[in-house]
């Protein structure tokens, strides 16, 4: 049975895939495969050459052998929309639809290949534990990748109930806001249920990926948002707030208030992958200052008329911010030097085109971010 012949095509909000992010644009993209009798579905989980896919008829298991190229940037991942064979043993994923966005980090290989953690994401939720000392540099690193993905970053400060008083919590939020210009910063306590309604409202109607290092409280937060204990939770060490990987695979789950959530394993290593635009977005105040420098190619080291150094001298720009900016730019330049520029440009063009279309669709449904 073709997708368009199912009762309640996309024009009806009762379409089985709407809760997982299906919309008119995805339906149009899928039309050629629909005419071939293939099933539309969204990848819920990928595991060793197979994936779980939610389709109009329910959940099924499919083999990814036909869509497993040598390029790790083009393999099927959680969040992809795919065309699946309607029957067979095994049944195969035949292709995936062009991605609107993708969250990518570099691998530890000498070739510095990119690793896709999640696809077609609207919000990148960076979970930061308040049970340990804030690492603003790590927050900035996550945000650079989030901005580069095409998603809207959101920082969620978890375990707020462990902060001794409201004044201290306010200062911590302000510190993170300074490191995250243009990014909503929310504090929550999954144990007490505080702040969850606000976060759920933000994430409703879109696809969100939940990111953070081990021990950040991601699985506890995911369970609180889902309203049930879906993700396993392990205890963290009091001394450093770290714990074992609770989530070992990337899972996509429908939220009760609307939207879907992709939970990822705790990330100990978060390398940049062609994220210059994202870095510039995180440090937008430095980019604005750089535009005022006397020389267009100013390196902000010792040049006369450097607006960045002037702001550093007056205290307008914290030295920590400038150091972090330089560090991330240097790292990104090393990664870029090792990778195929033509391939990167091709992938980025495709994502930006689809991302613009996806953002327009989201704004039409929900209105722009307030």
Curated annotation (Swiss-Prot):
EC number: 3.6.1.-
CP-type G domain residues: 111-270
UniProt-listed NCBIfam families: ribosome small subunit-dependent GTPase A (TIGR00157)
An example Gene Ontology CC term for this record: cytoplasm
Listed SUPFAM superfamilies: P-loop containing nucleoside triphosphate hydrolases (SSF52540)
Native species: Streptomyces avermitilis (strain ATCC 31267 / DSM 46492 / JCM 5070 / NBRC 14893 / NCIMB 12804 / NRRL 8165 / MA-4680)
Alphabetized UniProt keyword annotations: Cytoplasm, GTP-binding, Hydrolase, Metal-binding, Nucleotide-binding, Ribosome biogenesis, RNA-binding, rRNA-binding, Zinc
Residues that, per the record, bind GTP: 158-161, 212-220
Protein name: Small ribosomal subunit biogenesis GTPase RsgA
Biological role stated in the UniProt entry: One of several proteins that assist in the late maturation steps of the functional core of the 30S ribosomal subunit. Helps release RbfA from mature subunits. May play a role in the assembly of ribosomal proteins into the subunit. Circularly permuted GTPase that catalyzes slow GTP hydrolysis, GTPase activity is stimulated by the 30S ribosomal subunit.
